[in-house]
Amino acid sequence: MEGGGGGGGGGGGGGGGGGGGGAPYATRTAEEVFRDLRGRRAGMIKALTTDVEKFYKLCDPEKENLCLYGYPNETWEVTLPAEEVPPEIPEPALGINFARDGMNEKDWLALVAVHSDSWLLSVAFYFGARFGFDREARRRLFNMINNLPTIFEVVTGAAKKQAKEKTPNSSSKSNKPSSKVQSKAESRSKSKLSAPKDEEGSGDDEGEEEEDDHDNTLCGTCGTNDGKDEFWICCDNCEKWYHGKCVKITPARAEHIKQYKCPDCTNKRTRA
């Protein structure tokens, strides 16, 4: 077994990369499964970028079928696949080490990245099926995943290129709904508003930019910008926007909140 980056953190060696030795799983939400995926993803990105020299050496073509595992605690490991059949959770691509010396290093890393992306999706939706996610939960999970750059995009540099292309067209408040919306709620604090309806379209450039800004606004919980006619609320601490229904805040309740903190910011303060 080849270790890497503090490997066994999420589930123990090649035994499924995060399974837990056959112990039953507690029910999880889409957000919890997403956090699991995000940790595994961070570990695999680390293996293919900052720890790439160590990863390259561990993938010796002379050894048996090796796999790259990512763990929920943002560590990674190169090791043999699980011995149990069927495995506790889906397995990553086998034999990533065999192609190492027959390809350009960048191409090989990109290939491993593609297979890693595929594995993350399979693990996430395995959990979705195991925990009985309904259509709405599966949609939330997919949208949250889709808002992250893929491992392939990070490893090949495509993620940075996309970010640079977006920057010139986005304002400093591109993550918030348009100022038209805020003007509708001037009697409220900046954190409380309803999502915009297409009003009085003036057709000028400024209006188009504001519309683009709102189109780019994503709910911090479900990761979508669906429900443009629904109530939204902004966290005064992290300035992320949320569907009211996702954080269980109604317009009536929002009227009495002087400073709103989202669940993530509230939990951080509690832990501190």
From Swiss-Prot:
Any one Gene Ontology cellular component term annotated for this protein: nucleus
Positions annotated as zinc finger (PHD-type): 216-268
Residues of the site described as Histone H3K4me3 binding: W232, D236, W241
Subcellular location, record wording: Nucleus
MF (Gene Ontology): histone binding; transcription cis-regulatory region binding; transcription coregulator activity; zinc ion binding
Main localisation: nucleus
Biased composition (Gly residues): 1-23
GO biological process: chromatin organization; regulation of DNA-templated transcription
Chain positions covered by the region annotation Disordered: 1-24, 162-218
Start-end of Acidic residues biased regions: 201-214
Swiss-Prot/TrEMBL keywords: Chromatin regulator, Metal-binding, Nucleus, Transcription, Transcription regulation, Zinc, Zinc-finger
Biased composition (Low complexity): 168-182
Domain-related comment: The PHD-type zinc finger mediates the binding to H3K4me3.
Entry similarity comment: Belongs to the Alfin family.
Function as written in the Swiss-Prot or TrEMBL entry: Histone-binding component that specifically recognizes H3 tails trimethylated on 'Lys-4' (H3K4me3), which mark transcription start sites of virtually all active genes.
Protein name from the UniProt record: PHD finger protein ALFIN-LIKE 6
Species of the source: Oryza sativa subsp. indica
